[in-house]
């Protein structure tokens, strides 16, 4: 089945809404060390929001407008994405209010006014998204003479997330 870049992007946003965890790192900081972070969104596109703590090493090392890279794997390993963008600390109270939920609240003793609460915003610019077909199916196709490179070419796309 052929997939357009737009279809792959839609699959990415849908998978992110259900799985939420990705690995987030700053370009050129700590040799690109990435941390698992829970992404929250407000629709079918970015930005990606992350609740964290002011004592998180990423927050402490974050100059405003830092280049960031995130890696995402859907829970069933059927979709992968490498996301690039700009990461900002953005403690916007209106956004905190909109995104606040019981799972976030569990991390902050002081609630929305906890002095350790920090909110990060990833303005995603582009991503490379891969759909992963069943490796068993790929093996069967190869036995039947199907070129796996040709079969896979419509399952990867570079998409603009702005």
Language-model-derived ranges and their functions:
Residues 113-162:
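C-terminal edge-of-domain segments
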């Amino acid at each position: 089945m052929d997939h357009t870049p737009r279809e792959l992007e839609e699959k990415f946003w849908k998978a992110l809404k259900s799985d939420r965890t990705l690995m987030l790192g700053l370009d050129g900081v700590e040799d690109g060390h990435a941390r698992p972070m829970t992404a929250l969104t407000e629709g079918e596109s970015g930005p990606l929001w992350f609740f964290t703590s002011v004592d998180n090493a990423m927050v402490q090392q974050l100059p405003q407008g830092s280049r960031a890279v995130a890696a995402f794997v859907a829970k069933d390993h059927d979709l992968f994405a490498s996301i690039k963008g700009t990461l900002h600390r953005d403690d916007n109270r209106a956004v905190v209010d909109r995104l606040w939920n019981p799972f976030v609240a569990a991390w902050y003793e002081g609630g929305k006014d906890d002095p350790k609460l920090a909110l990060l915003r990833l303005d995603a610019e582009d991503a490379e998204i891969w759909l992963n077909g069943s490796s068993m199916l790929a093996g069967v196709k190869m036995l039947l003479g199907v070129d796996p490179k040709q079969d896979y070419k419509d399952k990867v796309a570079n998409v603009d997330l702005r």
